[in-house]
Amino acid sequence: MIMKNLFITLIATFISVVTFAQKPDPNFHIYLCIGQSNMEAGARPAEQDKDFNDPRFSFIAAVDMPSMNRKMGEWYTAVPPICREGNNMGPVDFFGRKMIEVLPEHIKVGVINVSVAGAKIELWDKNDYKEYIDNERDWMKAIVEQYDGNPYQRLVEMARIAQKDGVIKGILMHQGESNSEDPLWPERVKKIYDNLCKDLKLNPKETPLLAGELKYEEQDGVCWRFNRDIMPRLPEVLPNAHIISALGCESTGDQFHFSTEGMRLLGYRYADKMLELQGFKEVEERTLTLDTKKLGIEISPTLAGIFFEDINQSVDGGISAQLIQNNSFQAYNVPFNTDSDEFSKVDTVFFGWTIINKEGTGKARTVNDRPLVKDLKPLYDFDPDDEYDDSKKYQQYSVRFDVEDPGQGFGIAANGFGISEYVRGWGNKGMYSNNTQIPSIPVEKDVTYDLGLYLTGDSYSGSFSVYLEDKDGQVNSNVITISNIGNDWKKYEGTLKAERSVDSRLCIVADAAGTFYLDFVTLVPEASQLWMEGKYGPFRKDLLQALADLNPTFMRFPGGCASEGTDYWGQVFWKNSIGPVEERIGFRNHWGYWTSQYIGFYEYLLMAESLGATPLPVFNNGVTCQFAGHKYVAPLDTQEDRDRFQSIFVDDVLDFIEFCNGGVNTEWGAKRAAMGHPEPFNLKYVGIGNENRGEAFWDRFDIIYKAVKATYPEIIIVSTSGAADAGREFDENMKKIDELYPDTIVDEHYYKGDDWFYTNGDRYAQGMKRGAQGNTYDRSKPTRVFVGEFANNRTNNAYASTLAEAAYWTSLERNSDMVVMAAYAPLFCKKGYNKWNSNLIWFDNRGMWRSTNYYYQKLFSVAGDRAFEMTPAMEGAVADSTVYMSPTIDTETGEIFIKFVNSECVNKTFTVNIGNKKVYNVSVEFISSFDTKVKNQGDQNYYSSHPDYNKVPSFGGPGAAERPGLREMAWRFAPKVKYTEAIVPHTKEYRKVKKSFDFIMPENSVGIIRLTPAK
């Protein structure tokens, strides 16, 4: 009896132990994972990922992995691969690692990953999977066969094993590329979700499904519309579904897959959401309350504008659509700069041109004894007795050819605006525009190009062939033949149609011996390629469209320092830039390269008009750039000096005002009309000087100021506070303005770093001290501020600079009763020509990259006409100091605009209390990036004409020349430049709202909320 009772006790104990062993551990959280190739995992581990071996994160092998001694149905520490052999890392890996990093140490995480590359969602449909897979590709069938032909069933089987050890807490999914145009995808997902809940006895209310977005368009994703059009319906169909953003997740470079860092960020976002749902991560909640009845200041209607300066090769080779560099051969003519690396030093080297000699003999050189324009009249009365030989400004150069034997052709080729290597400064090599020998004219297939050139001869009897040619000497267009050129200059015109989209050069080749001259060669794309089809001048279409998208209200031009010049020869005189292009006087500009003035002041006025922007020209006042050594100051010592100053510098401003606003019966108004614009340009502003200081400047400023006020009292003059935001120069200039020129708009410039922009948001607030003299920005006085140049220039347009600048911009708008204008600087930079490392728009010969600074300027370019009262972003009873905002309202339409910056890497859920009973349509447009080091323009050496991207790809092997298509294939796989931008705006539309609405302010974001009254 005793033995029997002991046996029963032992049996009961055994049963109890077994029962206890089989009881699931509530602290072992299990997640089911399905999807396509990104979920399957193809990212190579980074160095930081390789030593992971924490048993708190494990997985059940859903297939055998014999090479790793892993058996299906058993648990292993989650050392990749965790899906199948041959995989790497994916979002599931990073999800689990982030989870155990945040969760209490007693909680473990397990995953089951049954994903199949390329598969439609139908593969996980327990009823219809077989019909789907039977019609799929063999390689996919082979993957599915590892799951015994039924991935859904394998997932359920593995989940049941897992349920013996832990508790299923959710489902992770990344699928959709193969269903990217399937409007029923949300319903298909719900069906699978419902089946899993039923088969595994899961409570849907306690089992969230997290679905990750696909690659965005800016990451070259081809399925981005799925994120916009289909995926948002999933939470509507499946209430416990949550969308995980892929915004900013880095790409591998193909159309579908994320890189390791992209996978990491996506996996962390899955984890953040799951932790939030489980209460392990605090939801960042904020409130915002509007009171549109309490109106504030009037918002300056001219606050957002642009500053266009000829810097970084912005004009020739930039906004100018004329494709021939040094088209008039004047770039040889650079007085006082013959030692410059950037210009030809001898008359047989042609800046940007290459001699063509096909087995012939001859010579070519620049000469100035055969001027294209006879009796070119100087428009300024320069002193003939001073140290400068002003006749050099007006010398005209052409190329003389003396052909002894043409061989197969003797002539010259224009290479366009390319680059070549040169040594800058202290032995530093750079890529610049010196004597470009690389064919760099960016022609497009089937586009026609309007050709113009001038020829004359000394009884020359031969003909010329004009055509496009690629770097391999292959003709890339039709051939224009010119004959019987005569002994007088004559313009020849024609059209060339490109056969291939390859960088080319323009060849002008003679076929006979003799002497002839060539001058003023132009090549301009057909009207369809020009801004507004050329109606407003020969401007490059894409670059001007980018400016138009900024909605600029004013345009300052042509500088900056470029308006002053570094020395006597670099001064800008507008009269030399108008009239027939053949008569315009080029010069070496402040930034060290040749300015042809093919785009002159008249074209700048047209440009501003086409953009809907008020022109704001800046004039040289006889003091060259003081930062560049103060090399020239126009003399005022004698009456003759003063008269000459009047005729050159004072009259230059007065005559330009007449050119812009005068009637057609005035001298300069008539010239405007003759150029095709009888209507006035309605000039309102004139800038005198730039970042100037000291007595020499203010004496000359005073003369011009008084002359303009006496003749055109309606014109508003822009003065200057100098080159810094504070300091002795700033204080002295502001004192001078306070005392003598209070009716001017003072132009302030500053280039700073993140901290300055974040901490100076109250710079223009009422009552704040201005400089060291104790004065304030007093609204009761007429002086107003133009922030004519500003930028966060410490990080080369990294996204961090955008967050800081945008935060500062909200303060400019909040104080736009004082700050009436503001403009980022510089506006443009051509890659390979950068004189400045932070620029709003980067471009090359074929495309552009808009910086994230550009995009916040675009988002913030719209506003209402009045500010109104709004609470700060409140976190409970405390204002969030990392959120910067500016609210305005259009008092006529009732539309509300709220600009915002979230400078913290945290998503914040806002409840916005509108404060009235109206119904609104709400949209939020924003940019955001987890990584604040991202630069939209990428590497400085990443552009189309750079040698690394402009090589002839190698191909060869036996019979290579006879193999058609081999060359084309080599080009196809050669390195190419892409014009994608990592960070671009996205829009979230809301249904009609009333009284209040919720929205998520993304991490590190800049955006604008628009509330439009519903009709």
Predicted regions and their residues:
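C-terminal beta-sandwich/jelly-roll accessory domains of carbohydrate-active enzymes
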Residues: 903-1015
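Extracellular and organelle-lumenal recognition/adhesion modules and their flexible linkers in secreted
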Residues: 283-596, 614, 631-644, 695, ...
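Aromatic/acidic polysaccharide-binding cleft in carbohydrate-active enzymes
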Residues: 248, 257, 302, 310-311, ...
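Noncatalytic carbohydrate-binding groove/subsite architecture in carbohydrate-active enzymes
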Residues: 149, 155-156, 223, 504-515, ...
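Conserved SGNH/GDSL esterase-like catalytic core that processes O-acyl groups on lipids
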Residues: 66-162, 180, 218-220, 399
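An active-site-proximal structural segment forming one wall of the substrate-binding cleft
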Residues: 148-166, 496-499, 503-507, 532-552, ...
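The substrate-binding groove and active-site-proximal loops of carbohydrate-active enzymes
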Residues: 80-89, 140-148, 176-183, 257, ...
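Solvent-exposed strand-to-loop "edge" motifs in beta-rich extracellular domains
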Residues: 454-459, 497-499, 862, 901-903, ...
